[in-house]
Structures are given as C-alpha cells and as structure tokens.
UniProtKB/Swiss-Prot annotation:
Keywords: Ribonucleoprotein, Ribosomal protein. Pfam families: Ribosomal_S10. Involved in the binding of tRNA to the ribosomes. One of its GO terms (molecular function) is tRNA binding. GO terms for cellular component: ribonucleoprotein complex; ribosome. HAMAP family: Ribosomal_uS10. Belongs to the universal ribosomal protein uS10 family. The keyword Amino-acid biosynthesis does not apply. Part of the 30S ribosomal subunit. The keyword Ribosomal protein applies. It comes from the Bacteria. This is Small ribosomal subunit protein uS10. GO terms for biological process: translation.
Length: 102
C-alpha cells in the first residue's frame, strides 16, 4: 500500500516560501520518504485600483498588486515517522500550508 502526501504551500513572499520548501524536503528525506518537487504552480496576480482623490479627479488613480506564489511537494512512501518530522518543522507565519493524504 502506497502512502502519498501532497503538500501545497502559499505565500506572498517567494523567499519565505522557498525557505519553507527546503525545510520540508530536508526533513522528509531524513525520515525516509521519497520526494517529488518542489513543483512551482502559477502565481496568482491580483490588481486593485483605487481613486486617489476622495471627491473629483476620476483620472487620478493608484494601482496596487498582490502576488500569491505557490509550490507543490509530493511525498511518496510516507510513514508515521514522516508525519512526526513534519509536525516538528517551524514554518514562518507568512506561509500557508494545505496537506492532502491518500
């Protein structure tokens, strides 16, 4: 029976994201799991347009952008040891994690 774990990471800062990915891959390899990835997923880009003036000057606007970077890591042949190793990793607060078990 194969145990497969998919870990999807999200962050606005790609440096924090890559640092977290390295930590997860290192601890997974130490526990004996086979690692596929990191697979970079498409970056989501959101643009917000806001009027600078509260009353007139409709043509005076400012645009803000938010990019969400994503990575996917697939772990094969995971064991309880792998799960314990992953629980002990300290991930920065700017990184969100979504884990799917199969």
């Amino acid at each position: 029976m194969k145990n497969e774990m998919k870990i999807k990471l999200f962050s606005y800062d790609h440096r924090l994201l890559d640092q977290s990915v390295r930590k997860i891959i290192k601890s997974s390899q130490d526990s004996g799991a086979k690692v596929k990835g990191p697979i970079p997923l498409p970056t989501k880009k959101e643009i917000f347009t806001i009027c600078r003036s509260p009353h007139v000057n409709k043509t005076s606007r400012e645009q803000f952008e938010r990019r969400t970077h994503q990575r996917l890591i697939i772990l094969l042949n995971t064991t309880e040891k792998t799960k314990e190793y992953l629980k002990n990793i300290i991930i920065p607060s700017g990184v969100d994690i979504q884990i799917t078990l199969r």
